[in-house]
Amino acid sequence: MTCLALASALRNPLLSAVGQAQTPTAAVLGLPHAGGTCRLFRGWERLLPQDTQLLALRYPGREARLTHAPFRRMSDLVEQILSATLFLEDMDLYLFGHSMGALVGYAVCQEMEARGRRAPSGLV
């Protein structure tokens, strides 16, 4: 992944970088539980290889996005995640979902397959 691709992806308010990988070639996208925040994944960057960027999903209605209306339908959330991760298609992308986040990750994988997009390298 180029730094430009990562910078483009991070322009989306849905994504937050956790730490900063040196010349990342892969990314892990953390999907928090219902009511959770990207803080759940703080410290995890130290557990990943140096070439893997940790990203976390920032749900609307939480933290810095407190004034943003929450999603009412899973399909709307999935659409936003697909848009946010479009710049990351040239790299290995892993989705890690906690509780409801796992369901979100599964729905994202299904929609990527339905659209013929490159599937994530892993879903946990």
Regions found by a protein language model. Give the residues of each.
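Domain-scale detector for complete catalytic domains at protein termini or as standalone homologs
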Residues: M1-V124
